[in-house]
């Protein structure tokens, strides 16, 4: 019996359409087969995607592993490994039943094998009990979706089916996904701390003075157009009293000969002091805008007697 148990192999990754006879026919060329079983689900009777073959001698077992591991069988890529009975079990428990809860075997060097009734067991620490590959659980096995699109869900080789030569990336895919999400969340809040409300106002203060509105709205009248206002070009753009100087300069200029509406005057520069001609038209006696006095004095308007007629 020990020789029989030492010649048993595990075949994983089988298509649901593969039967015991198909499996025995494929492996019979390596030697005499004593037993061939595909494990079934207890409730539904469906294939669980793996089985066991017992050869008559060890040489046939080694040759079958060397030739069939990672090869195409039907529309799947299968895995073939040596199976060993679990320790502490007698012969009856070790073999188990096709629809039993535990097959009673482990893959050599991979740890214990315990196929749950619903396919929730595992092979070793990180190996799928359905296909025998490492890197994913049985519930995530690519072979669970049936034979669509080629071997192992459409993958053509054992290495490419699991993202690399060792095939250990699928098991940690979910954990890495949450790690990346946590890293993103941390970076997002770190960014908020770096560019939050405080820095937003600080950056604005770098370009806009704090007293911008105070200087424009509440400055003293004499200092409103002095330096410091952002609309001024210099401190002398609007000097105090410039409007009065302009008006005084206008009064001092003598009217030109041809353009004076009110007569008098001669062309030339400003004439300061003395005489009616040197004075502005607003300061002359009898200016056109001078209000007539009721005393009957001279002026451009009629005397008060004229208004008395009405």
Swiss-Prot record:
Location of Phosphoserine modifications: 15, 295
Source organism, top-level taxon: Eukaryota
Organs and tissues of expression: Expressed in roots, rosette and cauline leaves, stems, floral buds and flowers.
Main location, first listed in the record: nucleus
Record-linked Gene3D superfamilies: 3.30.70.330, Zinc finger, CCHC-type
PROSITE patterns: RRM, ZF_CCHC
GO cellular component, one term: nucleus
SUPFAM superfamilies (alphabetical): Retrovirus zinc finger-like domains, RNA-binding domain, RBD
PANTHER family associated with the record: RNA-BINDING PROTEIN 4, SRA STEM-LOOP-INTERACTING RNA-BINDING PROTEIN, MITOCHONDRIAL
Protein name: Glycine-rich RNA-binding protein RZ1C
Source organism of the structure: Arabidopsis thaliana (Mouse-ear cress)
